[in-house]
Design a protein with these regions (language model features):
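Short, contiguous alpha-helical
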Residues: 2-14, 22-97, 138-182
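Short, aromatic/basic-rich helix-turn unit that serves as a nucleic-acid recognition element
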Residues: 18
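Acidic/histidine-rich alpha-helical segments that form the ligand environment
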Residues: 95-137, 152-158
Length: 182
């Protein structure tokens, strides 16, 4: 296991170059999380609510969506826990994109706190799963067809989820204030 101390100009810890599987996966996920934090850093409500082109996607909606995704995969799916607030009272049948739409009613501080709290819960959930069965541990909530993804799969999926949304965040942030960068 290699200690990671390389931090870039945006304050992101670089993923490890030579670590074990857990360190590599969590290092890349944390790097993607840090990239997303950078893309939303310092924006006010207008910035977090801005859209671009024909999309209704906003950085504020993305903060809330990624908070939901963190909680859904690492706590609800992996550990079989009941949804945490605010997800526990959502009528997803009435609005399947509630996380995106409701963000317009939240302050920037509320959105950032919702996301950072979800990330903290996810880190704890991953640590618990690693201690209890490692990367091969299967999610407690099975899919409709009876299959269950492993923690390894969930970590890879979350890296993909953040990488995709970080591409969206790049475009949105540049349209707001011209800030660019990976």
């Amino acid at each position: 296991v290699t200690d990671v101390t390389d931090v870039d100009e945006q304050g992101r810890t670089e993923p490890p170059l030579a670590d074990d599987e857990v360190g590599t996966l969590t290092g890349f996920l944390d790097y993607q999380r840090a990239t997303f934090e950078w893309k939303t850093r310092g924006l006010d409500a207008a910035g977090l609510g801005a859209t671009t082109a024909a999309s209704s996607m906003t950085l504020g909606g993305m903060l809330k969506h990624l908070a939901y995704v963190e909680d859904n995969w690492f706590n609800r799916s992996l550990h079989g826990r009941d949804p945490a607030p605010p997800w526990d009272t959502v009528d997803w049948q009435a609005d399947e994109d509630w996380d995106w739409h409701s963000a317009a009613h939240d302050s920037p501080d509320e959105l950032r706190t919702t996301w950072s709290d979800a990330v903290a819960r996810s880190r704890t959930a991953v640590a618990d799963a690693l201690a209890d069965g490692g990367l091969d541990q299967l999610a407690r909530r099975r899919w409709a067809d009876g299959r269950a993804p492993s923690l390894r799969w969930i970590l890879c999926h979350m890296i993909e989820e953040y990488a995709r949304h970080n591409g969206h965040a790049d475009l949105l942030r540049e349209s707001i204030d011209g800030e660019t960068g990976e």
